[in-house]
Amino acid sequence: MDTFTSHRRVRLGRREKPAPLDLSHHYSAVTKRRMPSKIKEAYKFFQIPGILNMAGGLPNADFFPFDTLEAQAAKPERWTPSPNHPGETATSSTSSSDSAAATHIVVPKAADESDPSKKIDVTTVLQYGLAAGYPPLLSWVRQFTRENLQQDTPYKGGPDVVLTCGSTDGFSKTLDLLVDQWTEGVNDITDRPGLLCEPFVYTNILNQAQPHGVQVVTVKSNASGMAVKGPGGLEDVLANWDPSKGKRPHLMYTVTLGHNPTGIVLSVERKKEIYAVCSKYDVIIVEDEPYWYLQFPSAAVEEAKSRGLPPPTASTTPKSARSSGYPFLDSLTPSFLSLDTDGRVIRLDTFSKTVAPGCRLGWITAQPALVERFERINESTTQQPSGFVQGLISELVLGSNSSGSNTPNQRARSAFALLRSPRERAAFTGWDTSGWVRWLEGLRGTYERRVVRMCRTLDAGATLITTAPAPLSSRSDPDSEWAPLAVTKTPLYTFRWPRGGMFVWLRLHLETHPLWQAACPSSPQSPPLVLDGPALSAALMVWLTTKPFLVLVATGSMFSANDEVRQEDGWRYQRICFAAEEEGNVDLAAERFVEGVRRFWEVTDVEVVRKLLGELGPSGEVEALEEGVSSLGWYMGC
Ligand SMILES: Cc1ncc(COP(=O)(O)O)c(C=O)c1O
């Protein structure tokens, strides 16, 4: 039994929750050397009432050119939710008659509020601030995380949070925290850090990890997510690690709800198995969850209906011991954090898919010792997310939190209200947590309805049906003038309806294409190109961008974790995003895709494919798009 397992057993024998493990042996050399910023340490003294601050290099807030920050924002009821469980009706009310109306939010110049966690004003939010985040927003995120999202984390004291500039920033800081730079030819191979992930992975992670010299180590995955047992599964990779190839990986990256690109939702059972192996081999789990609220409870049922299959057996989401207070949040598959007895989970959240990517705002949830290190990293890198965004999001989710009707905040609201219609005046407030959850439910509803529509169209076009006169040998009466027809069904692609997220992950059956393995003459000097999987897959992507199809999808090779995956499997897949196009274009885009694929299978001239491949840039990607192309790949790297 290794040290980590024995620690855990001893602690779990007691009744009280165990303290999280000390994971400082995983810190990078840079992290170990990071000291608190002397200036940021002094910030707490800035808050002393009446203090005249001559210490900080702060510009005077009177000279900020913004007197208020204001926005017309959606009401939480703008979108109609979908049911939390198949066959139910939505728990929240559907959209009200004025759901399209906006609410008006105002961040005033100076709020008359002594509690920094309630004071939302231009004077503080546009000033230098705390590295952990703007106090009102940080305290709301902390409360939402600890009370509503991760109310059951099994270690003593529960997790803490720190704000980031989005999940990309969160992962970059995680690498800074845990990974020492490794350079080939300079450092010893046995020191090379490794990152465990699925064979198909959100591309940006690779772009972030590889320049640090990190070796990306893939773990076999199946339709239910990362495999634990069997050859190539997690246990096999870690137990049989060959140290001559690098250090045994101490870090895992995964997306468990609506995986990008595969759309898988990892079950709690699988999470428990993965967690146990990570605990045994002392691996830190980075759970990146931008799609957390987009879990589609109807997907399995609708998939069976669309395919004429028997209804699936109803699955129940394991319940937390303590309710979040919101049936919608309770209905989501629990996070790795709910199993995290050791404190080895670092979870990345973002406002990118729930508010807007341009916010560049998110947060990290982890055990407090790790959060403290992240704060130190924030201090000397981004310092804090943008004040404009922190101010507007604070106002949006916290609403009119300052008490009394004569506060500057209220006065600013009243002044504005005079100019607006009575209906808008009535809607003059922020959302609060219940409004935030209602917003999330509505988003899930809109995306779930889109995925159902798109997948039905994709199902209908998945097989090419052709008819031809049956061969003479198979006819019962060869002399009859009525030739019976032979029907051929050619599978073009197969897919599983996504259980969450924003993507459909299609497996193409290019081996059924008439030009599969055909020789394609290139230049007189070079040998002919063979139209294999990678060539046909690339040609199909370009073909779809031409008239009359005009759709852009992302190919699996873009998400392949390494060259081996790219060569063996990457070309078999295409990722289709059903989120980016306007509602009215979802059916059109799916229909054009289906038609484009079907017509591609009718191409029998190698010259057509050769020309399509000539359109690709040196990187193998489409360089210029025709006007009017609907993007189902959007953005390719996201
Ligand atoms: C899995 C995953 N992580 C992170 C991101 C980016 O998040 P952020 O905008 O917060 O950096 C994306 C965006 O597509 C994503 O799919």
Predicted features along the sequence, with ranges:
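PLP-dependent enzyme catalytic core of the Aspartate aminotransferase-like
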Residues: 135, 520, 546-552, 557-638
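Short, solvent-exposed loop/turn segments at secondary-structure junctions
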Residues: 57-61, 168-169, 201-203, 224, ...
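Conserved glycine-rich beta-strand-loop-beta hairpin in the small C-terminal domain of fold type I
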Residues: 424-455, 459, 468-511, 518-525
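Conserved core segment of the aminotransferase class I/II
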Residues: 96, 107-110, 117, 140, ...
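Conserved core of the PLP fold type I
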Residues: 78-282, 286, 292-339, 534-535, ...
